[in-house]
Amino acid sequence: MAVVKCKPTSPGRRHVVKVVNPELHKGKPFAPLLEKNSKSGGRNNNGRITTRHIGGGHKQAYRIVDFKRNKDGIPAVVERLEYDPNRSANIALVLYKDGERRYILAPKGLKAGDQIQSGVDAAIKAGNTLPMRNIPVGSTVHNVEMKPGKGGQLARSAGTYVQIVARDGAYVTLRLRSGEMRKVEADCRATLGEVGNAEHMLRVLGKAGAARWRGVRPTVRGTAMNPVDHPHGGGEGRNFGKHPVSPWGLQTKGKKTRSNKRTDKFIVRRRSK
């Protein structure tokens, strides 16, 4: 994998930094594992904008990724690594011994021809999935379940991982990349190793058009608007002289939004700022 800085042949190329991986499959994705992925434009079922700055972008097909990894005891061989436009991580197409093919998140170091497996008897090596009660304390894992059988929810982005720091009876304690430490049931599954494509964070889009290809629209400052459009709008000069708020008058920039008190008991230590 190489990080390539483009030559300044035009203003749009001057700042572009690409991540090039020659191991990625150059052909089409595996068609039976594709689904239609319609654009919402940030609108809900009433046609109202619920998420701003979303719209347009290149047409994409959704790759059905196996986050549950529940084919226990059946070995699989990695056929190829692929790019996935729906996530920062790359994905791997694996062929199980019974003939079924599935997409999985590609861990760091995984390559075509490698063998992986799921279940309590799987070896302790990157790419294998086990219940966390069977994984040694201190191991780094990704695609971690929060409820047994629900499928991985934690550490799925490129370059991310979770560390198992303790095991106490029916629970294991995890250290997340944010610094948060939380308890999860020991029967929850996790995949060994960290997610690959860590160089994703080094890429630079280089121009506004590259963001538009990805379906991201411009973000306009509230102070640049009129009073009818935003609480920060209008006035002579640039000061808005009040606490920063959203376009709907709700406090922003640092206000806590978490309200899930039901699972607070599982958080051992809050994330570091």
UniProtKB/Swiss-Prot annotation:
Protein name per the record: Large ribosomal subunit protein uL2
Start-end of Low complexity biased regions: 39-48
UniProt source species: Klebsiella pneumoniae subsp. pneumoniae (strain ATCC 700721 / MGH 78578)
Assembly description: Part of the 50S ribosomal subunit. Forms a bridge to the 30S subunit in the 70S ribosome.
Keyword tags: Ribonucleoprotein, Ribosomal protein, RNA-binding, rRNA-binding
InterPro entries listed in its UniProt record: NA-bd_OB-fold, Rib_uL2_dom2, Ribosomal_uL2, Ribosomal_uL2_bac/org-type, Ribosomal_uL2_C, Ribosomal_uL2_CS, Ribosomal_uL2_dom3, Ribosomal_uL2_RNA-bd_dom
BP terms from Gene Ontology: cytoplasmic translation
MF terms in GO: rRNA binding; structural constituent of ribosome; transferase activity
SMART domains: Ribosomal_L2, Ribosomal_L2_C
